[in-house]
Amino acid sequence: MPPRLEIQPQRSRVDEDLAFVITGADPGAILDIEVSVQDGALREWCSHATFRVDSEGIIDLRRQAPLPGSSWSGVDPLGPLWSMTPKDPSAFFTRTRAWALTYHAVIRHDGKQITETTFTRHFGDEVCREEVHQGPIVGTIHRPDDDQPRPGVILLAGSDGANLEAAGSLLAGHGYTV
């Protein structure tokens, strides 16, 4: 039976912890993990890491560091996410909306794919989004999906005109009206 890759939770907010665990692998084997995602401009970003399977046939990113030459070093369960780079090194990660991101994770042994899975990170599924156009005031309100009074946060974009949809949605998911 091939090794099994579990990423928990399968669906989570972008600021929640993840557990990447491979089980059922041959102790001492060297496995490669590649994680990829597309940004809002449909550019692919990816990270890679090489691990030695422990004596119990497990790789757990909460307990093990990747081998040298990986995208990150040290024990870091979120290393596969923050260490992603684009094929074009001058590119910036583009988010045009607060849509969920679907990641693809592949495990390889000796260059051959042995298992894969997908997982999703979102900015706040449980929020309402409302456009505001009142005279000279234009904006977007993000709020929890209930009618309870909530503390408010105002997000102001800088001179670059950055889109703050993701930040607004994420804060609303934590109980703020933004």
PLM regions: where:
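N-terminal cap/lid segment of alpha/beta-hydrolase-fold proteins
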Residues: P3-R13, L18-A29, L42-S55, F92-P151
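Short amphipathic alpha-helix adjacent to the substrate-entry channel of hydrolases
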Residues: N163-V178
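Beta-strand-rich binding/interaction modules
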Residues: A29-V35
